[in-house]
């Protein structure tokens, strides 16, 4: 069947599992052991976990990536389903995999699953996803496309290495499904899939044995992902799919479909799944997502997520989440042994990831917020924007007041509803329970001073007790 004409953009998915006996562990592949090889380099970083299928990957796949062969450059894709309006940290390794391939000169495609998201990928799930309305999926797909393009732009602008890179393209699979008729599609595609094979996937078996079972829509997901791979193979010459290690079943379906139709071999590369300290996969469904959209997770929160990583994880994460050369990572870890209290590896990890996700400005913002919150820095506070303060103190009430002559500390606290009326509120100040811009105030009648109580950005940060913050924006100073 000839693939229909492409019109739009796309974003990927990760899917089912397969019998691990058909996988060739990277450590056993002599062809991947060359110190300068792309696959060997990513194996050393721990970014590429497994290759599929075993047949041909000892020699053929490494040759595909060799700059000295006629097959160079290759096209590789990874899919992302728009089940939310933002990427999250759980998607970063797949994106880092695409970026490393792009840096090596290959062309990469980020495929937004504007069509497949409506079915829901069952891989790694114990129950069916909540169905999304069509307009919600479309809005999410637009947001993911913008997020992917922003990340690609930051990568291009801030992490250049002097090499000639390949292209980064964002597509959406709704472009080739929106004109498909169900009966025509099943007639052309369905005959190439065997029910026994589809039912044998581990992800399918787990769901079929569960009390909730599996819907036809979810079951059909692997067929559509296989067709995506075929379409990109026909249209772009894409021979490699990248995905999380829970996507092996879907990758296998694509391999079998393309091989039956064309006789050609295609390949899959998996990246490891990142889990929380409890072992849960990081993602929206697990309820522990750290988002890459500033409106959902601020640069400061993203930065702190990586700063808080334990010592036993940070070296691995530096290899996975950054482009730092391995010798430099070794040096960072050696310094850490001498001065562990400085948390140098964690800070470098946080800086590299935040810069990739939010750009240099986002990294600067995260550092300002860190200084303001954890180091009581007045200098950091007075250059923070309204947005940064709101991000940093998400639960803090935000008020805007005109500064009247003679406005006192007591007046300010009461206008902001930060203290109770009457003697109790007065005592909270005199007993040292109130600070303004990290400076304790004990005289309720003190008149506010611009430059001390009011920063040069027109803001005052009230702190009542240990953890109750109030933000005041002064107008027409």
From Swiss-Prot:
Disease link: Myopathy with lactic acidosis and sideroblastic anemia 2: A rare oxidative phosphorylation disorder specific to skeletal muscle and bone marrow. Affected individuals manifest sideroblastic anemia, progressive lethargy, muscle weakness, and exercise intolerance associated with persistent lactic acidemia.
Subunit (UniProt): Homodimer.
Motif 'KMSKS' region per UniProt: ranges: 281-285
GO biological process: mitochondrial tyrosyl-tRNA aminoacylation; translation; tRNA aminoacylation
Name of protein: Tyrosine--tRNA ligase, mitochondrial
Leading EC class: ligase
Record-listed E.C. numbers: 6.1.1.1
Lineage: Eukaryota, Metazoa, Chordata, Craniata, Vertebrata
Motif 'HIGH' region: chain residues: 82-91
């Amino acid at each position: 069947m000839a693939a229909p004409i492409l019109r739009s953009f796309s974003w990927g998915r990760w899917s089912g599992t397969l019998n691990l006996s058909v996988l060739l562990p990277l450590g056993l592949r002599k062809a991947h052991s060359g110190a300068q090889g792309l696959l060997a380099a990513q194996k050393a970083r721990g970014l590429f976990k497994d290759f599929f299928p075993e047949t041909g990957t000892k020699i053929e796949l490494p040759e595909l990536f060799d700059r000295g062969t006629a097959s160079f450059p290759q096209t590789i894709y990874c899919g992302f389903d728009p089940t939310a309006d933002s990427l999250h940290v759980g998607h970063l390794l797949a994106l880092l995999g695409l970026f490393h391939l792009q840096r090596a000169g290959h062309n990469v495609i980020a495929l937004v699953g504007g069509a497949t998201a409506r079915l829901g990928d069952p891989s790694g799930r114990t129950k069916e996803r909540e169905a999304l309305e069509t307009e919600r999926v479309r809005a999410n797909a637009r947001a993911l496309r913008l997020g992917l393009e922003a990340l690609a732009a930051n990568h291009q602008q801030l992490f250049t290495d002097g090499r000639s890179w390949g292209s980064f393209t964002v597509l959406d699979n709704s472009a080739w499904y929106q004109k498909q008729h169900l009966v025509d599609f099943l007639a052309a595609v369905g005959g190439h899939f065997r029910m026994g094979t589809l039912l044998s996937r581990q992800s399918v078996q787990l769901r079929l044995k569960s009390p909730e079972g599996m819907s036809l829509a979810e079951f059909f997901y692997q067929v559509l992902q296989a067709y995506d791979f075929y379409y990109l193979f026909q249209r772009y010459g894409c021979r490699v799919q990248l995905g999380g290690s829970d996507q092996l079943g879907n990758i296998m379906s694509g391999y079998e479909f393309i091989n039956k139709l064309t006789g050609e071999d295609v390949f899959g590369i998996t990246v490891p799944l990142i889990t929380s300290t409890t072992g849960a996969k990081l993602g929206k469904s697990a309820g522990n997502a750290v988002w890459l959209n500033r409106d959902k997770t601020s640069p400061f929160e993203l930065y702190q997520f990586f700063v808080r990583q334990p010592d036993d994880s940070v070296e691995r994460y530096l290899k996975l989440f950054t482009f730092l050369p391995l010798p430099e990572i070794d040096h960072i870890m050696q310094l850490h042994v001498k001065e562990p209290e400085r948390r140098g590896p964690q800070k470098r990890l946080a800086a590299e990831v935040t810069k990739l996700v939010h750009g240099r400005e986002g990294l600067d913002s995260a550092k300002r917020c860190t200084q303001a919150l954890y180091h009581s820095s007045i200098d950091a506070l007075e250059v923070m924007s309204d947005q940064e303060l709101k991000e940093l103190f998400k639960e803090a009430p935000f008020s805007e007041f005109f500064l009247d002559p003679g406005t006192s500390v007591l007046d300010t606290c009461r206008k902001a509803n930060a203290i109770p009326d009457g003697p109790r509120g007065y005592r909270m100040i005199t007993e040292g329970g109130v600070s303004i811009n990290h400076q304790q105030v004990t005289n309720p009648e003190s008149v506010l001073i611009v430059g001390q109580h009011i920063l040069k950005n027109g803001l005052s940060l009230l702190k009542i007790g240990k953890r109750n913050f109030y933000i005041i924006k002064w107008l027409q100073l």
